[in-house]
UniProtKB/Swiss-Prot annotation:
Recorded metabolic or biological pathway in which this protein acts: One-carbon metabolism; tetrahydrofolate interconversion
Keyword tags: ATP-binding, Ligase, Nucleotide-binding, One-carbon metabolism
Catalytic activity: (6S)-5,6,7,8-tetrahydrofolate + formate + ATP = (6R)-10-formyltetrahydrofolate + ADP + phosphate
The gene coding this protein: fhs
CDD domains (alphabetical): FTHFS
EC class of the enzyme, as a word: ligase
Annotated ATP binding sites: T70, P71, A72, G73, E74, G75, K76, T77
Source species of the chain: Methanocorpusculum labreanum (strain ATCC 43576 / DSM 4855 / Z)
InterPro entries for this protein: Formate_THF_ligase, Formate_THF_ligase_CS, P-loop_NTPase
GO MF, any single term: formate-tetrahydrofolate ligase activity
Top-level division of the source organism's lineage: Archaea
Identification of the protein by name: Formate--tetrahydrofolate ligase
Pfam families the UniProt entry points to: FTHFS (PF01268)
Amino acid sequence: MGWKYLLSDIEIAQQCKMKKITEIAASLDITPDELELYGSYKAKLADSLEKRLADKPNGKLILVTAINPTPAGEGKTTTTVGLGQAMPKIGKKAVIALREPSLGPVFGVKGGAAGGGYSQVVPMEDINLHFTGDFHAITSANNLLCAMIDNHIQQGNALDIDTRRIIFKRCLDMNDRALRNIIIGLGGQTNGVPREDHFMITVASEVMAILCLANDIDDLKERLGNVIFGYSRKGTPLYARDLKAVGAMAALLKDAIKPNLVQTLENTPCFIHGGPFANIAHGCNSVRATKLSLKMADYVITEAGFGSDLGAEKFFDIKCRYAGLTPNTVVLVATVRALKYNGGVKKEDTTIPNVAALKAGMVNLEAHIQNLQTFGVPVVVAINRFSTDTDEELAVLKEFCTAQGAEFAISEVFAKGGEGGVELAKKVVASCEKPQKFQCLYELNTPIKEKINALATRIYGADGVVYSPAADAAIKDIDALGRSNLPICMAKTQYSLSDDPNKLGRPKNFVINAATVRLCNGAGFIVVETGDIMTLPGLPAVPAACSIDVNNDGYISGLF
C-alpha cells in the first residue's frame, strides 16, 4: 500500500490543502450570515439555519459502530470519515457527523481522535485540542453548579442540603486519577464546609449529555433545571433550579449548543459536536448536529463510541428514541487483528497470519451482527484492512459474514482515502434501500431491573444481573421519584461483551455486576455502573502527552 504509511497522521493533515470553511458551507447552501466563523477553517452554525431548513426532507442515516476493540482501537472514526469521502466518488452527497475529541485520551492513549491516515477531519490539531471551546463551556457550566452548591452550604444552607448525599460531581477534560475522590473545604471556616467530593471527566458529565440531547436553548434550560444534584437531610431531591443556577449555566452554553462545521482531507463537510464517551456515558454526537445534517445531504454518516454493545445500543435506545430518528443502515467495523485478539492471540502477535485464531474470534463478530439485527436495521460489515491481512483470512471473513446475513466490504480508507471506500459506499447505498423495521430493545414503561436485564442477557449474553445493596437502594429511590420510565445507560468496559475486560470473544456463564445506579434526571436516563468502571480515567505509564510538542513556528507534532 506504499509510501503513504511513512507519514504520520499529523504530517498528512498538515500537508492537506484545506478549503475556506465558507466554501464548504456554500457546498451545503449555507449562507455567510448563517455562519459564525472561528478563523478560516472552523465555524459554528447559526440557529437561523435550523429554522430555515426545518421543512426539508431528511436524507438517509447511517450509523458506524464496531466489534469489541483492541486497546489500539479498530478505526471506526477513520472508516466513518473514509465512507463520507467515498460517497461523492459514486455521485452521492454526504455529510459526516462526529463527536468532538476529549483531551483525556488525546494526552493519554490515543494521541488524537480525528480519524487516521488519509481519512481525517481537519484542522486536526485544533479539533483534537481546544477546537471551538465547547468542552470548556460544558466544564464551566458543570463546575458553576458545583460552586453554587458549596456556596449555598457555606451561606447558611437554606435548602438543608445533606452533604453526604450530594451526587453531582465536579469535572475536567483530563485523565487525572488523583481527583477521583477528594476532600474539599479544608483550611478553616472561611474556606467552606469540609466534605468528600469527586471529579469525573467532562465527557461523562450530565451537562455534556444534556447539551447533546437538547433540541434548543429552551429544552437545554428545562433539562438543566431538572438536574438532581443531591438530597436534603429529610431525603427530598434537590434540583439545579432550586439554586437558581439554570440561567447562568445556559448562558455559558449558548454558543456551545451550536453545531461546529469543519471538513475532511478531501473537503467533505463534517459536523463535529458534543463528545460523550460510550463506555461511561451515552456515546453519541449531538441531536442538533445530526438532525441538521439530515436536512443537507442524501446520506449522513455518524458514529457511536466503542463497540455495538455500548455506543450503538445507546444510539438506538437513547438518542434515536428521544430524537425521533430512524437509522437506515449500520456499518459494523471489524479488523482481522481484533478478531484474532478475541480468539486468544496476544496483542503483539495479531499481525501474524493465523486463520484458526481468526475463526475462534469470529464469535465476537457474530454476537455484534446478531445484536444489531435485533434492532431491525440492515448490517454491512466493513473490514478495516491492514497490510498484514492475508487473502485467506479475508475470504474466511467474507464467507462468515454472508452466512450471517450481513453485507461485506473491505475498507482501505486509511491508506487510500475516499477511493479506498468506494466498495463500502456502494454496499451501504444499496443497504439503505433495504426494508428496515427499526425497534428499540425495550419499552420505557418496563421496570428498571427488567430493562437492565434485557441489556445484560440479550446484548451482552449474560445469565443475569447481580445488584449491590447501593444499586438496589438507588433503584428504589428512582422508583419512588416516579422516574423509572427512563432509558438505561450502561457504564461498562469496552473491551468485552461482559463487565470483565479480560473475558474476550463471546463470553458464556457470567453475570453483570451492577455496582452503582444513578439518575441523570436532566439528561433523561439512568446510569448503571458495572464492574470496576471509572468515570475519571488515569494516564498510562507513558502518556501520549510525552510525545507531543510545538515548535517556534507553531507547528504541533506528536498527535497521531
